[in-house]
From Swiss-Prot:
It comes from the Eukaryota. It comes from Cyclocybe aegerita. The lineage of its organism: Eukaryota, Fungi, Dikarya, Basidiomycota, Agaricomycotina. Disulfide bonds join C321-C362. Belongs to the chloroperoxidase family. Glycans are attached at N54, N184, N204, N225, N329. The keyword Heme applies. N-glycosylated. Aromatic peroxidase that oxidizes aryl alcohols into the corresponding aldehydes and then into the corresponding benzoic acids. Oxidizes toluene and naphthalene. Catalyzes the regioselective peroxide-dependent hydroxylation of propranolol and diclofenac to 5-hydroxypropranolol and 4'-hydroxydiclofenac. Catalyzes the regioselective peroxide-dependent hydroxylation of naphthalene to 1-naphthol or 2-naphthol via a naphthalene 1,2-oxide intermediate. Catalyzes the regioselective peroxide-dependent oxidation of pyridine to pyridine N-oxide. Halogenates monochlorodimedone and phenol. InterPro entries: Chloroperoxidase, Chloroperoxidase-like_sf. This is Aromatic peroxygenase. It catalyses: RH + H2O2 = ROH + H2O. Its EC number is 1.11.2.1. Its cofactor is heme b.
Amino acid sequence: MKYFPLFPTLVFAARVVAFPAYASLAGLSQQELDAIIPTLEAREPGLPPGPLENSSAKLVNDEAHPWKPLRPGDIRGPCPGLNTLASHGYLPRNGVATPVQIINAVQEGLNFDNQAAVFATYAAHLVDGNLITDLLSIGRKTRLTGPDPPPPASVGGLNEHGTFEGDASMTRGDAFFGNNHDFNETLFEQLVDYSNRFGGGKYNLTVAGELRFKRIQDSIATNPNFSFVDFRFFTAYGETTFPANLFVDGRRDDGQLDMDAARSFFQFSRMPDDFFRAPSPRSGTGVEVVIQAHPMQPGRNVGKINSYTVDPTSSDFSTPCLMYEKFVNITVKSLYPNPTVQLRKALNTNLDFFFQGVAAGCTQVFPYGRD
């Protein structure tokens, strides 16, 4: 079975202290777009970076990238990997970056696979980023970004539920309960418990399979709006493999994450002392182990708890190209139904970049025509 390139709930949408602050343009009316776009400082997006020239294990918690505590106004979000990279200076420490900076950071700091990085970064940028200014936020919006575009623009960054971020995260709660982005001690203790029960005190792929199923069942039982279809169906499985693949010291590389290191990444956004990145590029390696532990069909609760209903129209692991097509033709197109001139050009450019990360064998779609 083939599996689509996966990335955890990475990235962003919006503004930065060093630049004029801009929110996502998604959801604005044509009249609002016509008024706002001429006021923005347009940036020509850089080309997606290629793979690392040297992708071996190396010290990444080094003198050039020390951990620093948050300053007032710094942004962090639901993704422990991105939070950690920002706190070590691989990303701008304020939590706002361009797609190029993010792809470089996840490769250099964690040895994340290039194709997966391109796929996830541009997917998030398309739905949560500002395509004119080429800026993305890894978490919440902030007053330091300046005036937002008028409603109904999406201004939530990675914290925005239902565009990129989704339900049943390992250490963050569902958006239904009010906080989908902060570290959740209760959920982390569940991760520790499952690591003790199924991994001999270490988090590994066996633990990932059991914990993924547990979090799905918890959401079915408590969240009447639980949704587990299409994009989230893919990323939910992929993200459970990342701690075993990326948070284990690369000199050991045994897929066994100890709990001190897990807490350091998940809670404190901090690499362990003397930490080496993985010895080769990787992303969702072993995801088939997680999927096969407790196979699920995509679906959702229908307005009440314990009402999980299979959605036969959702893409799944046998139809990765359908996931890509629905993301572009439905999700992106619904956010930008009739873009013109500069915005249309930016959309087409970023859709082209996004397609570079899509699984081989899929056919590119052009919802806005070809430039």
